[in-house]
């Protein structure tokens, strides 16, 4: 494994790491979580998923001296004017308290009928080869669905138990991982990124 094939993932989220490793490691890229290198996360000051992904990737690359890949993703609910949006992970206040976020989302939608519960996941990815990379690889993908009335399924993470996938009679948390990795916002974004990697960087 050559050094440039090791990529620092600018995240401490093990759920995300599993999805990235499943797709990138067969291509020869070793994924190392930033927390394994004692790198903390910078303050997310961007106004969009893409801005935050670029910010996090540059910071991880600066701290590690290595290639860095950042994901900024979240859920946008139409009835809530796009909330929780870029604040998805800290919607309930404490960053990463998934259960509290799901409870708050259900409460916010308690009077919203089924036909008006449309939502979509977004995933922005940014890969930089060094902290000042003038041409970072970026992609933005989405995944359509709606918000259910209660949690279903034990797979996935985040809002997956509430996110009913358009065209499938199940939540994202009920999908087998190999299916989710193909059709989700992150799966699609990773597919687009790997295409760019194969054609631009190999």
Task: Give the ranges of each region predicted by the language model.
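Anionic-ligand binding patches
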Residues: 2-8, 14-202
